[in-house]
């Protein structure tokens, strides 16, 4: 054999062994049943030879014994025990075979280990003992065996969690009953490192049965955790409507705020829990901005893009023009975000378009500043529409316009021909400044014209500006239910554009025979 080849083969052997060990380690981590109990630290980088020499810090016989405990292979466990294996050996996470047997709910493996005097007091690197794992996994029989073997019933992990915390968090009712009724461990009902008692943890997970059990055992609390959250806030945060319903039977303060001055309604709104929002509204949750609260519920729903929640709040008569700390309305916020759907919803709800924020800007000015041209056009359409309604209030009371009203961009087949005509007019006929003349003729305000011009894409931007102004005009023309082509012809003549008017007349004569009534857009 080539000496260099042999030398290379020998050098690779430890690395291959390390790779196999690392693969087994990753597979083991992926299948640990208590992986949600503690955050696993990132493994430190080891050189391959060190990893190969001490996989998980165990001897080969010890690793085999732990694997046998994981799979409840009692025959192999017995054989290895006869070979004097150290049954209390710990891996690099400081876990013993008993940790794995309890975590897998393997009654037979646990019985074998306890009968052979396995230690029950070993805590892993996260402070988890076998009593914690039994409380989490919910095996009543294993819990009995561990207590009988002398396991520390009051042990805490690094997060200050004891057996009662873990049982409550994972909805293990029998374990809670045993700890409180049989062992009388009422002193386990204490805050963990985050200031949360078992009742908080049950509420956070939405475990209705556990909440009711803890209430029955007089282990409920209205205390706040270190973040200022009550059990009600934690349940609302995760949208647990049934849990919130049970919690409200214990105290009626549905509007209580946490340390950030956020109520349960605001929390549910921010996270888009529509069913819970509707329930809280039915419980008379306060819709008004609370003192020192940064964002009212409607603002939170808009900021977090929760259209269903927005509709629920508006149906409950939330003030559509409520102001936040910047004196902005929900429409300001939706316009700034460029959220077309929510802008449409708020516009149709009849919001006040004239309100200015602390900087003196209307929602239109905010949308223009943020370069949201679609929203700018919607807001101008709305301003013109509501001005028209005000002017013709009596004549449109019974109009069917409202049922089909939209301020969004029109893509309907009914208006395709007239939109094509307007595009040709804007891009091939109108000269610079012509569209502003038409806009002023059509009673566009200077603010509206400036908002359209805010979108700048170069010296030819006036084509796009003109087309947008023409489409906004079309929206209003369709609302009057007049013939838009005829109306445009007459207005072009009045504005001093006879050649353009003639092109419109020719277009109208071609389409009169096949014209259809245009829908409001």
From Swiss-Prot:
Keywords: ANK repeat, Repeat. Residues 420-508 form the Death domain. InterPro entries: Ankyrin-DD_containing_protein (IPR052457), Ankyrin_rpt (IPR002110), Ankyrin_rpt-contain_sf (IPR036770), DEATH-like_dom_sf (IPR011029), Death_dom (IPR000488). One of its GO terms (biological process) is signal transduction. Pfam families: Ank, Ank_2. Disulfide bonds: none annotated. This is Ankyrin repeat and death domain-containing protein 1B. It comes from Mus musculus (Mouse).
């Amino acid at each position: 054999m080539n000496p260099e080849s042999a030398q290379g083969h020998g050098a690779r052997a430890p690395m291959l062994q390390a790779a196999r060990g690392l693969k087994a380690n990753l597979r083991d981590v992926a299948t640990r049943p208590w992986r949600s109990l503690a955050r696993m630290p990132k493994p430190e980088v080891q050189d391959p030879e060190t990893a190969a020499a001490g996989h998980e810090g165990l001897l080969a016989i010890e690793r085999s014994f732990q694997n046998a405990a994981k799979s409840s292979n009692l025959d192999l466990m017995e054989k290895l025990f006869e070979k004097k294996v150290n049954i209390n050996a710990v891996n690099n996470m400081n876990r013993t075979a008993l940790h794995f047997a309890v975590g897998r709910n393997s009654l037979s493996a646990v019985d074998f280990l306890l009968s052979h005097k396995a230690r029950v007091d070993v805590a892993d690197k996260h402070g988890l003992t076998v009593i914690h794992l039994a409380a989490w996994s919910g095996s009543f029989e294993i819990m009995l065996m561990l207590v009988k073997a002398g396991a520390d019933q009051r042990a805490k992990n690094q997060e200050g969690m004891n057996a009662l915390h873990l049982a409550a968090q994972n909805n293990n009712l029998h374990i809670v009953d045993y700890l409180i009724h049989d062992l009388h461990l009422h002193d386990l009902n204490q805050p963990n490192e985050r200031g949360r008692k078992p009742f908080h943890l049950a509420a956070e997970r939405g475990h209705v049965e556990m909440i009711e059990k803890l209430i029955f055992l007089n282990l409920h609390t209205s205390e706040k955790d270190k973040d200022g959250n009550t059990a009600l806030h934690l349940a609302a945060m995760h949208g647990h409507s049934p849990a919130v319903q049970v919690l409200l039977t214990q105290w009626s303060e549905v509007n209580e705020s946490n340390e950030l001055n956020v109520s349960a309604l605001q929390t549910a709104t921010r996270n888009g829990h529509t069913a819970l929002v509707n329930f809280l509204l039915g419980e008379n949750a306060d819709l008004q901005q609370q003192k020192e609260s940064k964002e009212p519920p409607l603002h939170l729903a808009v900021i977090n893009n929760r259209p269903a929640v927005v509709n629920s709040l508006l149906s409950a008569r939330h003030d559509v023009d409520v102001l936040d700390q910047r004196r902005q309305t929900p429409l300001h916020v939706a316009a700034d975000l460029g959220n077309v759907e929510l802008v449409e919803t708020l516009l149709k709800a009849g919001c006040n378009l004239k309100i200015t924020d602390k900087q003196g800007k209307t929602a239109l000015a905010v949308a223009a500043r943020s370069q949201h041209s679609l929203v700018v056009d919607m807001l101008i359409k709305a301003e013109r529409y509501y001005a028209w309604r005000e002017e013709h209030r009596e004549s449109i009371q019974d109009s069917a316009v409202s049922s089909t009203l939209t301020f969004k961009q029109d893509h309907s087949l009914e208006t395709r021909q007239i939109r094509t005509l307007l595009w040709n007019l804007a891009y091939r006929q109108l000269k610079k400044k012509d569209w502003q003349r038409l806009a002023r003729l059509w009673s566009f305000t200077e603010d509206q014209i400036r908002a359209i011009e805010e979108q700048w894409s170069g010296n030819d931007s006036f084509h796009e500006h003109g087309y947008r102004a023409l489409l906004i005009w079309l929206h209003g023309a369709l609302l009057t239910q007049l013939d838009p082509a005829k109306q445009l012809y007459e207005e072009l003549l009045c504005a001093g554009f006879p050649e353009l008017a003639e092109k419109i007349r020719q277009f109208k004569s071609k389409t009169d025979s096949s014209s259809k009534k245009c829908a409001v857009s």
